Amino acid sequence: MRLGLYFSIGKMIPDHARHRLLNSSSVASLRKSNQKVRPQLFLANIGQLITLRYSSLKPGPRRGSGLKELGIIENGAVLCLGGKIVSVGTTKDALRDPWLKKNRKKVTEIDCAGKVVLPGFVDSHTHPVFVSPRLMDFEKRIEGASYEEIAAAGGGIRSSVEGVRTAGKRVLVEKVLTVLGDMAAHGTTTVEAKSGYGLTVESEMKSLEAIRDAASRWPGTVIATLLGAHVVPKEFQGRSPKYVELVCKEMIPLAAKRRLAQFVDVFCDKGAFTAVEAEQIFEAATQHRLSVRAHVGQLSETALGPFLRFNPASLDHMDHVREDDIAELARHDTVATLVPGANYFLGLKEYPPARKLIDAGVPVALATDYNPGTSPTLSMPMAMSLACTHMKMSPAEGIAAATINGAWALRLADRKGSVEPGKDADLAVFDVSDHREIPYWFGTNRCVLTVMNGELWGDFSS
């Protein structure tokens, strides 16, 4: 679908912002002084500008055929001021604009030379707070051990706990910051980051503080999630109700009081928490005004009805889902967040039923599920490639699921996930000539520039 939006820059710029325009030398000097810089950016000569502008007037996440509406502008242009997108259209219209003619030398201009520009990816499911990779699990899986067998032998999630419990917060902050930087290099600008490898009140709060501190040093956007209910720690084995009580009465209230999390997550599956326990945790989260989300259906079917009454932002994994639950989910705005990287790395033959969900009208998002055990990938393009090849999503559906629907899964769609005036200036520039190449060139990184809240990330000297 092609669009030609009228590029009326002058009308979009508030008067108080006009005197803050920076030229290139100003940007360079401010960078040297370590001040936060949001240069006024003009991206021009974009081969395909993927706006994700939507023709439907009905609010809510993309579903069905709406996932294929990319709102492509050929030879596009974008102007960003003060960390926001203010105008979108064709380069031809932009260069005619009187305001840009007058101020062009004061704006940091990026010639995209026919490359593809799209909204920064929204990775709505990650586990970045850990210390070491799970190499033993990797080898055991190669030898034929299942997820459940590895967990029963002391591997899996519990094997990451000791490292987080003993690590200093500074170590965790630097770890998370490195992850965020690597994600940005692949075009990701918004990240949901979970705790979940501490499993004590102290270690879960330390993990959330590490996320907060790392986020303060990264120009992108980070949404923190308390995942105290990841698994039952070994000291509570056989006493799951007591651990759930700890999560509900201590972890959740403290995370809410300290404003360390926006969401509470729970892993509801065999070997983790029951649906009844998940409901108890959701009740506690709701009482403390925290939104909820859940890992569900990764290993076995779980009835979704009890979860939906809490209006979860997303239900994630969804490998095993019943027909009646699909029909029910299609009547809600809860997003089904699919993480094919986990299925790939676990060597599974089956993948989440994306086609069935999409065709039924369920809103679907894609995420990396970045974690040390089952999906150690930072790359949203790789997640998209797996979605196309193993879940039969089209490239257009993959892009929408990785951007605007990811934003809906984090309840950030008013700010993130599309290239439209008024939204945050989050952009990814890919050195390809067609958007379909992004999932096509799997295992490579074609992202050459990322813009996060108006700040440049990458080698933009050329």
Residue ranges and their predicted role:
Residues 101-175:
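Metal-associated gating/positioning segment near the N- to mid-region
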Residues 291, 301-418, 430-436, 442-444, ...:
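Active-site-adjacent C-terminal substructures of enzyme catalytic domains
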Residues 46, 78, 83, 114, ...:
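Divalent metal-coordination and catalytic microenvironments
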Residues 42, 106-111, 224, 450:
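Conserved beta-strand scaffold positions in the cores of enzyme catalytic domains, especially
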Residues 17, 21, 28-38, 52-117:
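Histidine-rich, glycine-flanked metal-binding segment
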Residues 38-47:
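Conserved N-terminal strand/loop that marks the beginning of ABC ATPase nucleotide-binding domains
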Residues 184, 248, 256-257, 308, ...:
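Non-catalytic positions within long, well-ordered alpha-helices that form the structural scaffold/packing
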Residues 155-176, 181, 189-305:
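Metal-coordinating catalytic core of metallo-dependent amide/deamination hydrolases
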